[in-house]
């Protein structure tokens, strides 16, 4: 039995988001309102098993307070999934998740992530290689979508019929839809019904525009989900996992104080050459918002190019 079985029902998961859910932001979220489970940014196994490995290891940084965390992997070579999975337990991760849902064109044009929906032979090989490496040590999960260009529940059937996935996280849109149309949560209910008949032990997690805990509890109850994944919601409210968020009442000083803490932890965590400054800009609208002259301060922040300039702009 994996640790996933001991999580509350429904359990709440911080979604993997590239250049967002690094160790620094995960620690900020934990301090605000801790999710039951967290996923890393997706990291490329083919890069990790190459001479360029050192440029990717920052995505697998982990602090002692981050428990439990699952590492999310993507790539094309099953052997590299095997090798990377073998390393993960020793790094402190509690599980491995396979990205088969990212719809970004630069990723799918190479046949990875959501493109695997249309390449089930390779998808199966990747799952098998990962599961073999994980053994009884790490639970294996997949994060995906309900189809590539159109809804295709045979893809969900395929994944469930592997009989070896501990968890399946499903974004209730196709890859083609990206985030341009509302998610169809009824498809999550269909996935649960398929799970019940094909793989009763696989946990089903719903994803797609679920903004906070209250919303997630409604969706989980309606569709009998085991868990709920929140992604972009934390970029609107760092207390998204709280039963009741204090964020709407927070004023300028509190919000900027939390942003300064974020930046200072960024400085403390990464060596100068280890991670670029640019990802910090993704958090600008989260923290610099909801008070007078916020737009002017955001504009000033977006023109900064170093952490020192960024901190200075927050005190101007």
Predicted regions and their residues:
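Alpha/beta catalytic cores of nucleotide-metabolism and tRNA/nucleoside-modifying enzymes
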Residues: 1-8, 12, 18, 24, ...
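Glycine-rich, positively charged N-terminal anion/phosphate-binding segment
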Residues: 2, 17-87
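Hydrophobic faces of well-ordered beta-strands that scaffold small-molecule active sites
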Residues: 12-15, 38-40, 69-73, 96, ...
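Active-site beta-loop-alpha junctions enriched in small/polar residues
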Residues: 17-19, 43-45, 74-76, 101-103, ...
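Alpha/beta enzyme core
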Residues: 31, 82-96, 100-110, 121-202
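An active-site metal/cofactor-coordinating segment within enzyme catalytic domains
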Residues: 53-54, 61-63, 105-116
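Conserved phosphate-coordination/catalytic loops
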Residues: 75, 117, 121, 182, ...
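Short glycine-enriched, charge-decorated loop/helix-capping segments at active-site entrances
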Residues: 111-117, 177-178, 245-248
